Amino acid sequence: MLRLILFCLSIIPLCAKGQAQTVVFKALPEGINTLGDEELGRWNMDGKSMVYTSLTKEKVGLNIARFDDAGRMISVEAFPFDAIYNGGGHTLSPDGKNLVFTLCGRKGGFGDCDLYMAEFKEGRWTAPINMGVEVNSASWESQPVFGLDGQTLFFASTRPGGLGGSDIWVTRRSLTGHWSTPANAGAGINTVNNEGSPYIHFDGRTLYFMRDGKTGMGGYDLYISQLGIDDQWRTAENMGNGINSAADEGGLAIHPDGKTAVITRFTTDRQNDLFQFQLPEKFRAAPLQALNVVVKDKQTLKPVRARLEIYQVEAFDTTRLSQWADDQGKIATPLLKNKSYGVIAEAEGYLAYSANLPGDNAAVRSLEIKMIPLASAKGQVIVMQNVFFETGSAALLPGSIPELKKLVLTLKSNPNMKIEITGHTDNVGTDDTNMTLSRSEERRVGKEC
């Protein structure tokens, strides 16, 4: 029964139809792989740790493996979680503060297997709580994975209303903490067959999952789908021979580098072990970096629980992400490498804050935000970091819209506030030309506000 949390792999010779890709599978080291079964390995956002499900005769549990900068294993230990929770099929939110996993046959549950959530607070994990009838049903729910924002959850379920036996569903958490009624992921993902084991890369737009049926290589195969700009999933593509075989494949997850994958495979001694391999170029996701933010009061330096909006300057309309800082004023979130981002922080009683993060190739970035209380805002100079104009013109670029909208909201919320808008150009062109352009840009911003 416990193995139904995940999936069962079997030994069948490699499928011979189609041209095989050159894929080399490398077993993860001893200490991770054991005489028991290891499944569903998933890297954390920094790429230096992996949480996976361990199955023994006695129990199902979670372990965490840690790696150095070169990818060598340093240690393996039980996940810091009460051992009485005999569960697996897990996902951690990108900031590492929310854990959703599967428990089966629990008193007070809604179906055979339900999804439960625990939170990391004050240095420890809270007791898991059933995610409720909003998410769980009288059917089977399992194999969850958090989306990019930590507020979206994909999972597999056999609930009524799907397109086949097991489908992939999506639920979203509101600002009040309530999860929405799950929506079917749609016909681009789900079919009359069984879909499961979803994994959405940290880029938020690349979904990997498994599906059975006669059109694949055999058993369960791995598929990939991309999210279009219309927020619809494109028709999923079989990842092909070399990755898929006549046996079952599932449990794939991607390293933040976008090119390294981990998968569960059935070994010759009939055990499930974890293997990694390099994804073929066409299946790779964009490489990522971790952004660690801390928000403080500029005067007291105490943490501020601000709401942050983070967006790609070049594609603000499709990449916007909103998150709340925790009680320590901290947020951790993934960004695409080599992309420029705008950051806007808002908190009650404070002036809105903006920052611009030029693209770079670092694995980890840090940002400290010091917010100015409204009570002491008079005379303060606020630099709007994400207002952009076309070269030699007062025409605003689209990436300026989020910041200007926030300024408008601040003014509407504080009707007695008066501001002076001052613009500065670069040093290209004559002084007279630049002065004229600065005045034009000031008027343009004033008109938008």
Language model region names:
Residues 1-22:
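Bacterial Sec-dependent N-terminal signal peptides
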Residues 21-294, 321, 339, 363-364, ...:
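Short, conserved micro-motifs composed of acidic
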Residues 45, 94-97, 129, 148-151, ...:
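Solvent-exposed, polar/charged alpha-helical surfaces in well-ordered, non-transmembrane soluble domains
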Residues 103, 156, 387-388, 423-426:
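Short, histidine-centered active-site or binding-site loop motifs used for metal coordination
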Residues 106-107, 160-161, 394, 425-429:
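Solvent-exposed loop/turn segments at secondary-structure junctions
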Residues 211, 216, 414, 422-449:
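Periplasmic OmpA-like peptidoglycan-binding domain that tethers envelope proteins to the cell wall
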Residues 265, 273-275, 395, 414-417, ...:
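Periplasmic OmpA/Pal-like peptidoglycan-binding modules at the C-termini of bacterial envelope proteins
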Residues 283-310, 314-418:
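Periplasmic peptidoglycan-binding/tethering modules of Gram-negative envelope proteins
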